[in-house]
């Protein structure tokens, strides 16, 4: 997978 911690960080901020 394409694990992207950066994307997860943005996802949390968006939540």
Swiss-Prot record:
Component of the cytochrome c oxidase (complex IV, CIV), a multisubunit enzyme composed of 14 subunits. The complex is composed of a catalytic core of 3 subunits MT-CO1, MT-CO2 and MT-CO3, encoded in the mitochondrial DNA, and 11 supernumerary subunits COX4I, COX5A, COX5B, COX6A, COX6B, COX6C, COX7A, COX7B, COX7C, COX8 and NDUFA4, which are encoded in the nuclear genome. The keyword Mitochondrion applies. The keyword Transmembrane applies. One of its GO terms (molecular function) is oxidoreductase activity. Keywords: Membrane, Mitochondrion, Mitochondrion inner membrane, Oxidoreductase, Transmembrane, Transmembrane helix. This is Cytochrome c oxidase subunit 7A, mitochondrial. One of its GO terms (biological process) is oxidative phosphorylation. The modification Blocked amino end (Xaa) is found at residue 1. It is a single-pass membrane protein. Pathway: Energy metabolism; oxidative phosphorylation. Belongs to the cytochrome c oxidase VIIa family. It is found in: Mitochondrion inner membrane. It comes from the Eukaryota. Component of the cytochrome c oxidase, the last enzyme in the mitochondrial electron transport chain which drives oxidative phosphorylation. The respiratory chain contains 3 multisubunit complexes succinate dehydrogenase (complex II, CII), ubiquinol-cytochrome c oxidoreductase (cytochrome b-c1 complex, complex III, CIII) and cytochrome c oxidase (complex IV, CIV), that cooperate to transfer electrons derived from NADH and succinate to molecular oxygen, creating an electrochemical gradient over the inner membrane that drives transmembrane transport and the ATP synthase. Disulfide bonds: none annotated. The lineage of its organism: Eukaryota, Metazoa, Chordata, Craniata, Vertebrata. GO terms for cellular component: mitochondrial inner membrane.
